[in-house]
A protein has these predicted regions:
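N-terminal metal-binding scaffold of metallo-dependent hydrolase/deaminase domains
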Residues: 1-40, 50-52
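Conserved beta-strand scaffold positions in the cores of enzyme catalytic domains, especially
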Residues: 3, 42-46, 128, 146
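A short, polar/charged loop-to-alpha-helix boundary motif
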Residues: 39-44, 67
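Hydrophobic alpha-helical scaffolding
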Residues: 45, 87-90, 94, 160-167
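Metal-associated gating/positioning segment near the N- to mid-region
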Residues: 50-116
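Flexible loop/turn segments at secondary-structure boundaries
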Residues: 64-65, 120-123, 154-158
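Gly/lys/ser-thr-rich phosphate-binding loops in alpha/beta enzymes
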Residues: 90-148
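Metal-coordinating catalytic core of metallo-dependent amide/deamination hydrolases
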Residues: 128-199
Length: 199
């Protein structure tokens, strides 16, 4: 158990920071308040004149997929075989030993939403993952949290030699995939739990 005492607490609830103690047990905050009563064996950290924040969440990054300092062997950010790859999952490519996880944790970032880059119109799913750990399956907060979709210059630049010269083409490819997804969803609903009728 740890008690961070007398710090300026920024709790994301109150508009202004306030001086208080923060009690944590096994990495989880259990109490916030002034002059908390703590067990005798509790580790005390004096935070007088210091700021105390909850862990930050990085909403969009490629940590664990872009091979920081490794080069080609660790670069799994973009799958360049097809402009549409919605079936790909970040969790299948994340390297938990990527040094950027430790760098993020040291900067106060406790959770990241990491996933594919923006080369593809649909690049695959992002995952929410903790920045501390050695096994991806033990670090996951939520397996699938977003689908990467890119309309900018990257699909044009990356696939110009494969018949994707304009944003019109990019939009057309996305529209085609969304129509397929809608039709698939319609068939699943029509099957009504009858596995023999599932697409």
């Amino acid at each position: 158990m740890i008690c961070i005492k007398n710090g300026w607490v920024h709790d994301a609830v109150h508009e202004e920071p306030y001086i208080a103690d923060v009690l944590a047990d096994n990495g989880k905050i259990t109490a916030i308040g002034k002059n908390l009563i703590v067990p005798q064996d509790c580790e005390i950290i004096d935070a007088t004149d210091k700021n105390v924040y909850p862990g930050f969440v990085e909403a969009h990054c490629h940590i664990g997929l872009d091979g920081s300092g490794i080069g080609f062997e660790g670069d799994d950010c973009n799958e360049m075989t097809d402009i549409l790859t919605p079936q790909l999952r970040a969790i299948d490519g994340i390297n938990p030993m990527d040094p950027t996880f430790r760098e993020a944790a040291l900067a106060g970032i406790t959770t990241v939403c990491t996933g594919p880059g923006s080369a593809n119109v649909l690049g695959g799913t992002f995952t929410a993952i903790k920045t501390v750990g050695k096994r991806v399956d033990k670090m996951i907060v939520k397996k699938e949290v977003a689908m990467k979709c890119a309309f900018g210059e990257n699909p044009k630049r990356c696939y110009q030699d494969k018949n994707n010269y304009s944003r019109m083409s990019t939009a057309s490819k996305l529209r085609e995939m969304l129509l397929k997804a809608r039709e698939y969803d319609r068939k699943v609903l029509a099957a009504d739990s009858d596995e023999s009728k599932l697409p």
